């Protein structure tokens, strides 16, 4: 029996069909939050179901061809072709069954902070913001700046953005599936605009990423008593006030000390809601990292943080070179990468992660 060889795939198919029935019910259709959660799980199971159905089809066709092979040479030839095809289809199914990061289909919150290097570091942080914005545009994602602290020269001291996909993407197409590899220290080597002697300077910016929680995510519960909320005026370049009302929000989670600033929305109420969602996202990421550590899941730990205190990438302007130090990826198209052509760099991280997961599965 097919389900005896791949019981997990058979179970996935049953769940997939059950979810399709639920998503068609009026109760779910009228509940956007529930529909989104079911849609995410449906997309997550889709790759397994497609691979399983393809494997079942080849198995059935092979059995039928073998039955007729003794009577017809064409069927014998077809049986041989299907026998050659079966191992590849089976390998695709085994790969699809390897557990993915459960957050892959989620959207992403990203923080970019200027590090060592003064104004040059802030300018580089601004370059990273533009790079990720253009990359997101190429992927058809939206970018929402939630808070930003800029310098007079146009640099970025720190910025927080939400990167979101349209609809409910398959896990491999989710924002987190790609952006989770960006967390870490990014180093730049170039001649700063403020350098009169033409000397190359090294500076850095830090990137923190975490999957965005749903507004009604019941995995994380926050007691209002654990929150300290400060209200202030939004600030623009150089710290200048950009409005005359106190609509910006600083939300502090007292048990963990996590602080979230939100000033992008038009009203204090909207900023409170947005800040709470970001706080939930950070607590969710913290919870998942703790669970991974307790389970000694080294793959998940590597993917989730890749040690954010370490340098992960170097951007060398004089040589137009970019290097990813985790995968040894190197290319001489830095100008294109900074214009959003980032996929090849990210793919090197995805491929290394998939190879690691496959090795751990065997």
Curated annotation (Swiss-Prot):
Record note on modification: Methylated by PrmC. Methylation increases the termination efficiency of RF1.
Pfam family, one: PCRF
Family matches, as Gene3D superfamilies: 3.30.160.20, 3.30.70.1660, 6.10.140.1950
Signal peptide: none
UniProt subcellular location: Cytoplasm
Assigned protein family: Belongs to the prokaryotic/mitochondrial release factor family.
Family matches, as PANTHER family: LD18447P
Name under which the protein is recorded: Peptide chain release factor 1
């Amino acid at each position: 029996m097919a389900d005896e060889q791949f019981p997990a795939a058979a179970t996935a198919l049953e769940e997939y069909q059950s979810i399709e029935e639920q998503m068609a019910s009026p109760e779910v259709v009228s509940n956007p939050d529930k529909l989104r959660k079911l849609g995410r799980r449906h997309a997550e199971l889709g790759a397994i179901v497609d691979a399983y159905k393809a494997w079942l089809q080849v198995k059935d066709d092979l059995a039928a061809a073998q039955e007729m092979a003794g009577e017809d040479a064409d069927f014998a030839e077809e049986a041989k072709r299907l026998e050659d095809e079966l191992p590849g289809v089976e390998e695709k199914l085994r790969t699809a069954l390897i557990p993915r990061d459960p957050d892959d289909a989620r959207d992403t919150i990203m923080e970019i902070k200027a590090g060592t290097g003064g104004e040059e570091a802030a300018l580089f942080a601004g370059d990273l913001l533009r790079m990720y914005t253009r990359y997101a545009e190429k992927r058809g994602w939206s970018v929402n700046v939630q808070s930003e602290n800029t310098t007079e020269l146009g640099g970025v001291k720190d910025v927080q953005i939400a990167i979101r996909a349209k609809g409910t993407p398959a896990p491999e197409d989710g924002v987190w599936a790609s952006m989770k590899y960006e967390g870490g220290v990014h180093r730049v080597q170039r001649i700063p605009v403020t350098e009169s002697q033409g000397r190359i300077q090294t500076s850095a910016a830090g990137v923190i990423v975490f999957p965005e929680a749903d507004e009604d995510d019941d995995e994380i519960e926050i007691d209002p008593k654990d929150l300290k909320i400060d209200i202030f005026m939004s600030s623009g370049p150089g710290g200048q006030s950009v409005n005359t009302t106190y609509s910006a929000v600083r939300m502090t989670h007292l048990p963990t000390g996590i602080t979230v600033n939100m000033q992008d929305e038009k009203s204090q109420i909207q900023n409170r809601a947005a800040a709470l969602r970001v706080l939930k996202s950070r607590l969710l990421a913290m919870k998942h990292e703790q669970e991974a550590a307790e389970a000694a899941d080294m793959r998940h730990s590597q993917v989730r943080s890749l040690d954010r205190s370490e340098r992960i990438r170097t951007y060398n302007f004089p040589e137009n070179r970019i290097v990813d130090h985790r995968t040894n990826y190197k290319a001489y198209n830095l100008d294109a990468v900074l214009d959003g052509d980032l996929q090849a760099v990210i793919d090197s991280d995805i491929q290394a992660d998939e190879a690691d997961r496959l090795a751990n599965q065997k």
